[in-house]
Each structure stands twice: as structure tokens, then as C-alpha cells.
């Protein structure tokens, strides 16, 4: 090596001569920095940072920095995957756009490594305080040969001219005009002179694979990230456009759905009631004894189907739901007065008045319809039998609002039918003296099955006149005779003892008795507040909450000048041209996201929410004596006896009903049982029945639910693959809990 100079001054004064030792040019300050050879001096002007660079995806976390994943919301996208995608795409773009620099390497291995690393993102960092440097050194013996010395490593190159295409866009390198404007030091290819200050500049290559690749990695330009974020903005714009297209398509679909609501609607008299009469050759069925649980089967769903089939017979269940349910009136004329057996009677109503504290308004209504006006004549406090008798003598009708609360037979019928409809089923009874009427024309918010148990009644029923009147969610006010003039009923005729008439929700109806015979009918009602509208009332607020937490655009402020964009009143709004772009289209996109969220993630949980609501409102099951004996309720229990309920391997267990309980998830690691075993027979008369259930017992519950109505021994349950993931102790504790809350039958 040459002799090291002691000062910068002496180094500057030394003649520019060529040396055989390549290191001497560095010591003499004759070597040209690689940074100066290939890159201009960094600009001293403040660098503009695109706002997109500063945006970060915010995670939902609590004060302990624990990431939370919403149970119903989409999982937040991780930055890593998106970043890698943009790096790959943008790098490929750079390869196609950057100038072609033809440099022939003598080291073939280094060439292969460089080709390999061209697809990777390498950061350019300039740190003036670092000690590592990279230099080009001219070979003394060969003017066409240049050696790159980087951190102690040497790579030989042959000098070639840089060939640039005029048609290709410059990416990362400055144009010739920019180099002239920057007053760069001209590069002398013969002497490779360099300013000593440039010696301190260096390039730090960030290795992607290992340290050996560091020497050959390609230097990326400073504009790489700007280009990347421009691509991200373009993709974001494309995504916004796609959302707009989807929103437009869904808006069209929504409009088509709205138009289809009126298609096929048959108004008023054009609808026809269907009357089914019993064939004269069909033998009468024996009278039903409701005290003997006539429809009960091992499977509660089968029990429900039997009871409902009995109520509408001879129409079968499937035909009813296909042809009549919530669409047309069905009249069944059986010519069998004893068909409903001992379901209810006037004598039974007298017993209930005598033995129970029935109050006006709460349990009993007294009504009269005379000269086109309905009058309510309720008293105060308890309705005593003798007072009710006087009202009947005065041509008033008596309505028992909730007979299922006090009468076991009506309770049984309503309770078992609940599993057919999946919602609360209640009842009313109407006792009307001969030659009178108890109510004005009106419609109800429920589907009504009128069972004529005594006397006869003359009915008139009118169908809805418009789609707006179809299937209302609230009862109507009373209509007058003038209101009904000109409207032709879809059904008008007598309903005799043993007959049934089904009146869909929203059909106006009115009835009067025969001048010589009183009338008593039981109305079994279902479907109250049980519609898709009620479902959406529960799901949409939850979906809005989830979407608000996960979509920051929904949390943005409303556009400025909104009040000048539009309104209901036709005014000259100064910014009306911006209404669609800045308001309507944005709202449409949010509605599209809301619709997708509900459809993709919240429908299943909404079923659980409805089941939970059903468990709170539904009637409790009316158990047979055998079911009581095998359940926690007991029957004729000897409190001092030794016959305790024991759980052994041979003990058989079974759920008490298919839909008496529901296992619900509160979170990923917590669940509970909602049930109706202890519900009041008065609508929502007791608090909701909820019991915490161990998460370890889900598999055991699943086995019991899937095997219903079959009995399974504990040995069979514990031997199944589903339950072997938990210990027998955990499974047994979960099963015992089901017995303790009353939803499990146990047979030793």
C-alpha cells in the first residue's frame, strides 16, 4: 500500500498520478464515490411525505393492549399481507419501467445473485455518521476495468455506456437536465476524481436473505415508496368504484324487490275464501279428551304437528301452509258438534270466575256493539260471577283474555302448538248471548283460528284492499258501518259448533249470534310481533354497531353544505348538484356494506336472538305425570324416601322437549342456557330464565340435542368421540346441571 498522508492539504497538493496499488487512490482522495457516480447529491429541500404513508390500520384494543376480535365483525386485515402484495406488484412495475443499464460482471455468481434480488424491496439509507463506504477504483493496468470496493469486498466491472430509451419512463434516476441543474461534479472516466468530502458518504444495503447477498443487492430509488402509495391510492379508488357499482346494482335489486311487492297482490273481493266440508261418508272421530294429553308423542315436534292438524282437519298441515297461511281465509265445516270435546265451555268459564281472581281489563272484558257503536263496560277490580251474569243478561259479550293462564286444557293446546310456529301462542274466549254482537268490524295483528265450541255465529270477513293493509303489525281501530259500505266480503256465513275458521292477520271481520242461540268460541292466536320486520328491528341496530366499529368511513362527518344539497320541499338548493355524489352515493355504499354484513355474519346469531325471545315469552310445557316423575319437578315425591336420583353408567337421559331450552353463546369462552320450564302462564309474568352453562359441557349438550327424542345412557354419551375431548367429570357435571334446571329427564 502507499504511504498514508497526514493532512487533507498535502493530499490536495499531490499530483494526480496513477498507482499500481488500488488502495492508494483512496488514500490520495482520487477514488470516486459510488454514490456520486450513480446518484445525484440529495436535495436539501424538505421532502414531501404523502399522507397515505402516515395512515395506519388501527386495532381495537383495551387499556392492556390486548387485541380484541369482534364476535360478529369481520377480522381486521393485517398490514403484512397487504404490504407484501403491493411490494410484489410495484417491484414488477419498476422492472418494466426503469432504464436499462448494461453492466457486464466478471463474477457470474454475483450476477445470478443480483438477478435473484431484483424482485425484492431494498431500502436506501444515507447516514453521514457511519464508517462503512463504497468506492469505484480504476485499474491502473486496464482503463476499461473498474473495481467496486464495498465494505472490504471487491467486485470487478467493465466500463460500458449507459443506454437509455427515450420512450421509457425514468423511475428512481434523474434525467440529464436535472443533473445539469444540480451542478454536479463532472465524472472524468480517465482519472475518476472525487471530492474528499464525498468519501464519508456511503450506501447501506439492507440484506433480505443473508449477509452474503448484501454485497450484490440492487439499490432502489428514493421514489419507490411514493410510487407504492400511488398504487395503493389507485387500488383504493378502484375499490371505491367497485363498491359504487355494487351499491348501484343492489339499489336496482332493491327497487325491483319493492316493485315486486305489488305484483300478484289480489285486492278485496277478488280473493276467495276456501270452504272445506266433511265428506258424508267419513266417520266422525271420537270426542277428544284434553285431560289425557291426546296429542303427546315422544317427539315434541310431532306432538305439535298432531295438535295443529287436529285443529284444521280435514285440511292437512302442509296444504294449509302452502295455500292459506297469511293469505286466504279457510273455513272448515265438520257437521260434528262434539269435535272439540271438552276443550272449553260456558260452565268452565263460570268455574274460573269462581275460583280465580280475574280482574276487569286484565283478564275480563265486557263489551257491547249496538247501533254501530262498540262500548266497553268494564267494572273495577275483580269480575265476580254474578256481575258477569248480569252483563250477559243485558246483551253484552264477555271476553276472557288469557284462558291459557287458568285452564289446563287450553294451556295444553296452545303450548304444544308453539313448537309448530316457533313463537308464543295464546288464546281468547268469547261468550256472546243470543241476538247480539260484541265488537265492531276490525282487523287484528295476529293470525286467528276460531274454534266454535258452543252455539253458532254469523261471520263476515273482508280481505285487505291494498298492499299497505296486508299483514299489519298493529290492530286497527273500529270501523263503522259506513266504512264498510261498498266493500264485498270474501266470506259470509254461519260457523256451527265443531267448525273452524282461519282469519289471516289484517283481514277485517265482524260477527253476530243467532237470535235464539248463544255463541262461545275459542280464538287461538299466533304470529304476534313475529315477522321479518321484527327480525330486522333486532338485527339492524346490532349490525350498525358492528359496522361502525370496523368501518372508519362510517364514522366520518357529514358533508359540509348538506342542507343546501336537497330536501323534501322543492327549493333552489345551491349545492343540489353535489347531492348524489357527496351524499346519496356515500349512503348507498354504507347500506351495501350493512346489507353484506347482515347476510354474511349476523343471520345465524339473529336466529339465536329470536330463540332467546321465544324462551322468555312462551308458555311453559304442560308435563305428563310420567314426565314430572322423571324430571326434577317430581310426582308424588316421598321426601323421606331413599329413592334418590342417581347418575351411573347405565342411567338413561333425554331432553324434556326439543324446544324447551336453547344453548346460546355469550362469547368465545362463555355460554348459557335459556329455557321456559319455569315460565309463568301469564305472558312474560316472570323474569327470563337464564342459567350459566360450562363451556366444557357443549359437546355433551350437542349429543343430547342431536339424539332427541332417543334415550342415551351415560356410558354411551361418555364413549362418543365428541365427548372424549373432555373428562367424564366435566361431562357429568354439565348433564347434572341440565337435570337441576328442569330440562332433562333421568331414568335409572
From Swiss-Prot:
GO molecular function: 2-oxoglutarate-dependent dioxygenase activity; histone H3K36 demethylase activity; histone H3K36me/H3K36me2 demethylase activity; histone H3K4 demethylase activity; histone H3K4me/H3K4me2/H3K4me3 demethylase activity; iron ion binding
GO terms for cellular component: nucleolus; nucleus
Biased composition (Basic and acidic residues): 94-110, 194-203
Domain JmjC intervals: 399-543
Cofactor requirement: Fe(2+)
Gene3D superfamilies: 3.90.930.40, Cupin (2.60.120.650), JmjC domain-containing ribosomal oxygenase (ROX), dimer domain (1.10.10.1500)
Gene behind the chain: jmjc-1
Residue spans of biased composition, Polar residues class: 124-134
Stretch list, region Disordered: 65-135, 160-264
Listed name of the protein: Bifunctional lysine-specific demethylase and histidyl-hydroxylase NO66
Phenotype upon gene inactivation: Attenuated response to heat shock stress and reduced survival after heat shock and oxidative stress.
Protein purpose: Oxygenase that can act as both a histone lysine demethylase and a ribosomal histidine hydroxylase. Specifically demethylates 'Lys-4' (H3K4me) and 'Lys-36' (H3K36me) of histone H3, thereby playing a central role in histone code. Mediates response to multiple stress stimuli, including heat shock and osmotic, oxidative, and ethanol stress.
Composition skew (Acidic residues), residue ranges: 163-193, 207-264
Keywords associated with the record: Chromatin regulator, Dioxygenase, Iron, Metal-binding, Nucleus, Oxidoreductase, Repressor, Transcription, Transcription regulation
Organism per entry: Caenorhabditis elegans
Amino acid at each position: 500500500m502507499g504511504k498514508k498522508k497526514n493532512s487533507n492539504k498535502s493530499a490536495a497538493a499531490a499530483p494526480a498520478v496513477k498507482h499500481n496499488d488500488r488502495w492508494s487512490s483512496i488514500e490520495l482522495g482520487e477514488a470516486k464515490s459510488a454514490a456520486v457516480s450513480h446518484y445525484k447529491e440529495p436535495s436539501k429541500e424538505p421532502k414531501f411525505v404523502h399522507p397515505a404513508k402516515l395512515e395506519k390500520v388501527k386495532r381495537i384494543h383495551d387499556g392492556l393492549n390486548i387485541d380484541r376480535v369482534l364476535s360478529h365483525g369481520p377480522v381486521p386485515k393485517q398490514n403484512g399481507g397487504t404490504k407484501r402484495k403491493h411490494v410484489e406488484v410495484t417491484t414488477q412495475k419498476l422492472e418494466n419501467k426503469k432504464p436499462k443499464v448494461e453492466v457486464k460482471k466478471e463474477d457470474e455468481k454475483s450476477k445470478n445473485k443480483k438477478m435473484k434480488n431484483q424482485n425484492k424491496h431494498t431500502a436506501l439509507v444515507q447516514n453521514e455518521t457511519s464508517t462503512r463506504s463504497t468506492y469505484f477504483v480504476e485499474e491502473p493496468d486496464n482503463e476499461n476495468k473498474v473495481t467496486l470496493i464495498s465494505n472490504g469486498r471487491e467486485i470487478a466491472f467493465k466500463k460500458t455506456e449507459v443506454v437509455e430509451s427515450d420512450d421509457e419512463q425514468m423511475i428512481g434516476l434523474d434525467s440529464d437536465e436535472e443533473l445539469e441543474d444540480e451542478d454536479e461534479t463532472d465524472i472524468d472516466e480517465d482519472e475518476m476524481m472525487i471530492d474528499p468530502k464525498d468519501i464519508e458518504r456511503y450506501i447501506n444495503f439492507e440484506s433480505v436473505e443473508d449477509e452474503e447477498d448484501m454485497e450484490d443487492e440492487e439499490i432502489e430509488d428514493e421514489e419507490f415508496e411514493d410510487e407504492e402509495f400511488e398504487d395503493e391510492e389507485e387500488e383504493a379508488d378502484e375499490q371505491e368504484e367497485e363498491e359504487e357499482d355494487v351499491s348501484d346494482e343492489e339499489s336496482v335489486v332493491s327497487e325491483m324487490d319493492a316493485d315486486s311487492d305489488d305484483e300478484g297482490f289480489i285486492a278485496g273481493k277478488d280473493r276467495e275464501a276456501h270452504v272445506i266440508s266433511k265428506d258424508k261418508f267419513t266417520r266422525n272421530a271420537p270426542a277428544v279428551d284434553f285431560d289425557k294429553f291426546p296429542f303427546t308423542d315422544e317427539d315434541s315436534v310431532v306432538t305439535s304437528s298432531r295438535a295443529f292438524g287436529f285443529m284444521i282437519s280435514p285440511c292437512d298441515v302442509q296444504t294449509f301452509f302452502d295455500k292459506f297461511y297469511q293469505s286466504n281465509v279457510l273455513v272448515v265445516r265438520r257437521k260434528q258438534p262434539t269435535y272439540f270435546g271438552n276443550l272449553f265451555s260456558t260452565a268452565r268459564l263460570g268455574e274460573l270466575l269462581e275460583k280465580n281472581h280475574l280482574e276487569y281489563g286484565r283478564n275480563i272484558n265486557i263489551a257491547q256493539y249496538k247501533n254501530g257503536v262498540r262500548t266497553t263496560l268494564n267494572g273495577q277490580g275483580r269480575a265476580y260471577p254474578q256481575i258477569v251474569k248480569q252483563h250477559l243478561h243485558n246483551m253484552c259479550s264477555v271476553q276472557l283474555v288469557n284462558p291459557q293462564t287458568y285452564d289446563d286444557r287450553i294451556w295444553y293446546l296452545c303450548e304444544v302448538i308453539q313448537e309448530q310456529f316457533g313463537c308464543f301462542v295464546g288464546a281468547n274466549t268469547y261468550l256472546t248471548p243470543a241476538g247480539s254482537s260484541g265488537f265492531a268490524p276490525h282487523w287484528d295483528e295476529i293470525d286467528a283460528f276460531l274454534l266454535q265450541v258452543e252455539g253458532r255465529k254469523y261471520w263476515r270477513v273482508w280481505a285487505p284492499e291494498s298492499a299497505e293493509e296486508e299483514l299489519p303489525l298493529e290492530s286497527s281501530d273500529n270501523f263503522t258501518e259506513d266504512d264498510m259500505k261498498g266493500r264485498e266480503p270474501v266470506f259470509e256465513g254461519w260457523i256451527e259448533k265443531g267448525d273452524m275458521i282461519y282469519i289471516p292477520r289484517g283481514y277485517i271481520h265482524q260477527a253476530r249470534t243467532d237470535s235464539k242461540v248463544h255463541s262461545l268460541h275459542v280464538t287461538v292466536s299466533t304470529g304476534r310481533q313475529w315477522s321479518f320486520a321484527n327480525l330486522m328491528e333486532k338485527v339492524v341496530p346490532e349490525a350498525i354497531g358492528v359496522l361502525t366499529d370496523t368501518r372508519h368511513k362510517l364514522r366520518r362527518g357529514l358533508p359540509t353544505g348538506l342542507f343546501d344539497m336537497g330536501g323534501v320541499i322543492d327549493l333552489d338548493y345551491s349545492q343540489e348538484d353535489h347531492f348524489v355524489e357527496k351524499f346519496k352515493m356515500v349512503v348507498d355504499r354504507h347500506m351495501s356494506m350493512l346489507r353484506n354484513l347482515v347476510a354474511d355474519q349476523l343471520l345465524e346469531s339473529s336466529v339465536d336472538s329470536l330463540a332467546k325471545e321465544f324462551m322468555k315469552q312462551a308458555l311453559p310445557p304442560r308435563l305428563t305425570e310420567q314426565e314430572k316423575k322423571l324430571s326434577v319437578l317430581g310426582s308424588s315425591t316421598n321426601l323421606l324416601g331413599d329413592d334418590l336420583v342417581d347418575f351411573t353408567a347405565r342411567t338413561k337421559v333425554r331432553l324434556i322437549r326439543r324446544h324447551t331450552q336453547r344453548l346460546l353463546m355469550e362469547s368465545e369462552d362463555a355460554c348459557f342456557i335459556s329455557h321456559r320450564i319455569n315460565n309463568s302462564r301469564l305472558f312474560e309474568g316472570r323474569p327470563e330464565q337464564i342459567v350459566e352453562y360450562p363451556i366444557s359441557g357443549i359437546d355433551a349438550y350437542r349429543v343430547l340435542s342431536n339424539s332427541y327424542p332417543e334415550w342415551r345412557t351415560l356410558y354411551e354419551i361418555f364413549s362418543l368421540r365428541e365427548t372424549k375431548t373432555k373428562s367424564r367429570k366435566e361431562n357429568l357435571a354439565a348433564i347434572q346441571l341440565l337435570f337441576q334446571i328442569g330440562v332433562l329427564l333421568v331414568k335409572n
